[in-house]
């Protein structure tokens, strides 16, 4: 039986992030947009930050923090090569077991990097401890209904082909969960809001390619380990219709 606290295969997540070092620039426009939207929150404060942690930014966050005049920026990632993309001090670190001292940073930014964590409240507690008492956390995760159409198309195709379902897309939180997660982790002024990034693909296969390029392929422990039926993805693509496919990436933004 799978431990209820272990939803994701972290070793597989690490391997996929390591492989994605060579391909992640394929999705640079999406990750740049997500990072910019998250860092826009810094414009709402007059606070000057001096010690920042970029957690899982894949090379798209650390340079933006440095450009804002923050003198000390650490990039941390489960994959050493991905951390090195930040261009500065790089640390290989597991989001579930952070190696940083209490109060080490006055700013922590986690852009689309916490959704493969098994114990999200526990990870947020560790992030709070790594913050100085007056520090700021900015985090974003994909939230529902991100990839809802793709999820439904895959489920319908698999049900048709195999008569049952296997989880093929990571479970995402809802906006209503956000502030509660921060509150449970001990953040005094938790705020959760959402933003939408509109995406358009020529076909469903472009979606699959971008997910792989970003290291975001299925890592759910309960996934079906068998090779998918050859017809699965073409059938799912057909259910999404012909022509361009419009999707929305919903960013659940946590500020604490």
Regions flagged by a language model, labelled:
Residues 1-47:
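Class I SAM-dependent methyltransferase Rossmann-like catalytic core
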Residues 23, 27, 188-256:
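Conserved Class I S-adenosyl-L-methionine
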Residues 40-101, 107, 121-125:
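Class I SAM-dependent methyltransferase SAM/SAH-binding core
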Residues 47, 118, 132:
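Short conserved AdoMet
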Residues 50, 104, 131-135:
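Surface-exposed loop/turn positions
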Residues 112-116:
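Short catalytic micro-motifs in class I SAM-dependent methyltransferases
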Residues 121-136:
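A short glycine-rich, Lys/Arg-flanked "PGG" loop and its adjoining helix->strand segment in the class I
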Residues 138-202, 217-223:
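Conserved catalytic/acceptor-binding region of the Class I
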């Amino acid at each position: 039986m799978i431990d209820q606290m272990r939803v994701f295969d972290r070793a597989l997540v690490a391997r996929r992030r390591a492989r994605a070092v060579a391909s992640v620039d394929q999705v640079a426009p999406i990750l740049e947009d997500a990072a910019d939207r998250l860092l826009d929150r810094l414009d709402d404060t007059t606070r000057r930050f001096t010690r920042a942690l970029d957690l899982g930014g894949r090379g798209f966050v650390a340079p933006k923090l440095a450009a804002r005049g923050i003198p000390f920026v650490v990039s941390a990632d489960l994959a050493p090569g991905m951390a090195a993309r930040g261009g500065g001090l790089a640390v290989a670190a597991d989001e579930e077991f952070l190696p940083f001292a209490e109060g080490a940073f006055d700013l922590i930014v986690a852009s689309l990097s916490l959704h493969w964590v098994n114990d999200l409240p526990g990870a947020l507690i560790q992030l709070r401890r790594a913050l100085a008492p007056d520090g700021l956390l900015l985090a974003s995760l994909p939230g529902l209904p991100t990839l809802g159409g793709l999820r439904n198309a895959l489920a319908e195709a698999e049900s048709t082909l195999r008569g049952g379902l296997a989880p093929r897309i990571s479970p995402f939180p809802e906006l209503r969960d956000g502030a509660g997660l921060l509150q449970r982790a001990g953040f005094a002024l938790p705020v959760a809001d959402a933003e939408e990034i509109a995406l358009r693909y020529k076909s469903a296969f472009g979606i699959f390619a971008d997910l792989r390029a970003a290291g975001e392929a299925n890592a759910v422990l309960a996934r079906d380990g068998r090779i998918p039926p050859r017809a699965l993805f073409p059938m799912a693509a057909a259910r999404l219709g012909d022509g361009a496919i419009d999707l929305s990436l919903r960013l659940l933004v946590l500020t604490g």
